[in-house]
Amino acid sequence: MRACHVCPLKKPAGCCKEQTMNIVDQQTFRDAMSCMGAAVNIITTDGPAGRAGFTASAVCSVTDTPPTLLVCLNRGASVWPVFNENRTLCVNTLSAGQESLSNLFGGKTPMEHRFAAARWQTGVTGCPQLEEALVSFDCRISQVVSVGTHDILFCAIEAIHRHATPYGLVWFDRSYHALMRPAC
């Protein structure tokens, strides 16, 4: 007998009226998600498992007390074992004009070529910080939650480095768009 996924009493499947689900196929979900603009980030790590980085838009704040953000990482990604072992990362939010760097870190380019394409500093956690990023969040991974194909990495922020560039970069409708800070 299958247990009801909604009912905390573990009654048989179909017992709860709230169980009605709207099944959304993968393509419909992806098309809908393309309507949500998001900052473009390069996530980096360095530690016992080595140096790695990837492009991500699935990044957001969780709380400011303590300062925490989350990063979603596919467990099937080639970089997953490196991040999983190192347990530190830096979220480097890209500026307008860094689209080619985003594409480089989003592809199958070898790691040494990815990192050779930009200038980096070392953050307090030892992770690479992109010198020309809009902002960099240097973090320790405090918790990992698995959902479907991805791990949600909860990241305790240890340091923040802001840069002077006035232009941000977002991913919207499957393409890059530059944003400019309003004049004060």
Swiss-Prot record:
Q: What induces it?
A: Up-regulated by the nitrogen regulatory protein C (NtrC also called GlnG) and repressed by RutR.
One GO process term, biological-process aspect: nitrogen utilization
Q: What does this protein do?
A: Catalyzes the reduction of FMN to FMNH2 which is used to reduce pyrimidine by RutA via the Rut pathway.
Taxonomic lineage: Bacteria, Pseudomonadati, Pseudomonadota, Gammaproteobacteria, Enterobacterales
Q: Name one GO molecular function term.
A: riboflavin reductase (NADPH) activity
Q: Which organism is it from?
A: Escherichia coli O6:H1 (strain CFT073 / ATCC 700928 / UPEC)
Query: Which family is it part of?
Result: Belongs to the non-flavoprotein flavin reductase family. RutF subfamily.
Q: Which UniProt keywords apply?
A: Flavoprotein, FMN, NAD, Oxidoreductase
Q: Does the keyword Flavoprotein apply?
A: yes
**What is the top EC class of this enzyme, as a single word?**
oxidoreductase
* UniProt-recorded name of the protein: FMN reductase (NADH) RutF
Q: What Pfam families does its record include?
A: Flavin_Reduct (PF01613)
Q: Which SMART domains did the record assign?
A: Flavin_Reduct
Known EC number(s)? 1.5.1.42
This protein's source sits in the domain of life called: Bacteria
Reaction catalysed?
FMNH2 + NAD(+) = FMN + NADH + 2 H(+)
* InterPro entries linked: Flavin_Rdtase-like_dom, NADH-dep_flavin_reductase, RutF, Split_barrel_FMN-bd
Q: Does the keyword Oxidoreductase apply?
A: yes
